Amino acid sequence: MEGKGPSFKVIIVGASVTGLTLAHCLHRAGIDYVVLEKHHEVHPPIGAAVAILPNGGRIMEQLGIFRHIEDRCQPFQRVHLCFQDGFYYDSLSPSVVLKRFGLKFAALERTQLLEILYTHLPDKSRVLTSKGVVRITPHGNKMSVTTADGDEFQGDLVVGADGVHSVTRREMWRIANIEQPGLIPFKEQASMSVEFSCIFGMSNPIPGRKHWQHIIRIGPGFTFLIFPAAGDSLFWVLIEKLPHKYIYPDVPRFSQEDAVTRCEAAASQPVWQEVRFRDIWAQRRGFRMVALEENLFRTWHHGRIICIGDSISKMTPNIGQGANTAIEAAAGLANVIYAITQNHHQPSDDTIHRALANFSERHRKRLDAIHLESRWITRLEACQGWVVTAFTRYVAPHCGDLFALGVVRNSYNGEVLQFLPLTERSGKHWPKLEWWNTWGLSKWQEFGERLVYCFGVVILLWISWAVFNVNQL
């Protein structure tokens, strides 16, 4: 480990993508840490895919890990956005990203990413498995974390990287409401909701089909996401709108039988050209059905506890930013810890509070915009409402490469590790963000033509809406 700051120990709860990324960052910063993981292994074979986009990839590049991620991924150059009536259009966002940032669109199994992060962690003895946290207790300027097997760990800061069902978040709320009754109101504790289900899986190659691209199949109340995997295998996701909204923790739980029923019901749905979902389903290797929680909590920290990643920020997989914003949060928090431990004195409670408050406020502002985009895209791709459906089908295809715009825009203004040098691919010479380029527009004339077209479509939609309302009178 590097660094010469005072003795300061971080207890990371959860060997997740967030937790292991933070472990790498702290190692490079010379900060003492331990990772407590409740499962018996660090990278269980859970099967879900994860996308690494430039805002997460640049941090992995700084840590020297991105090249190992690239080695596990199947390259692709475009995204097919397909509709029920047979119409489709392409986004060149993977090619745009590679040209602009030097980073490939990376899609791999979450367990593969965890394996990479763990394998390349210099000191694996700091990652302890079968250590489910049951209690967190403040002791003056120290924190005590108790695990289910009775072990107790002492540290200066506890970081919750333990996912959507976070014990750390629950303990933070408990302690906060003991020390300041009402600090975490019930409204915030009940602010996470579920409106969509998700079946994610992986399939072996489909006979006669090679060289897959990323596919987004848009339909009424559902969305298919297809990602190419190594060896012409496929990652796939089926997202469906649920009959009504659920408030966490009273959310549905799904069995494998539920997943089979839904997938068989979707078997006849077209995916790409002559391939239907039944062809992908027939080659299935593994699958699982879950509820998709959505929320950005407002309170991220209290005292010497802070939550990051899915424990505090949960979105659907539609824009692929869940893991990437979690990686950003790990890097941003590492920057904060590094900064407050460089004056050779133990940071006070007040110093820690101000540092965590500034970090939370800054990162939450960025996440507010990304969450808004995620919620909008999720409902847009599920054709939720006739206005959204009309925009998706008839307006968006003529507005330039909106998909590339979103990816490129979210790649800027994110966190980087301030105590490590930037490389070419982590942003040292990234081109300046110019909005007309991100739209894929080569000429102002083309922009004018598209603007006029879109304005005309909007007027037609408004007239249709007005006529519809008159007819209802």
Curated annotation (Swiss-Prot):
Pathway: Mycotoxin biosynthesis. Its main location: membrane. It is an enzyme of class 1 (oxidoreductase). It holds the Pfam family FAD_binding_3. Its cofactor is FAD. This is FAD-dependent monooxygenase ctvC. Citreoviridin inhibits mitochondrial oxidative phosphorylation by binding to the beta-subunit of F1-ATPase. Ectopic mitochondrial ATP synthase is a factor that mediates HIV-1 transfer between antigen-presenting cells (APCs) and CD4+ target cells, and citreoviridin can completely block antigen-presenting cell (APC)-mediated transfer of HIV-1 at the APC-target cells. Inhibition of ectopic mitochondrial ATP synthase by citreoviridin can also lead to suppression of cancer growth by activating the unfolded protein response. The keyword Transmembrane applies. The chain crosses the membrane at residues 218-238, 451-471. One of its GO terms (cellular component) is membrane.
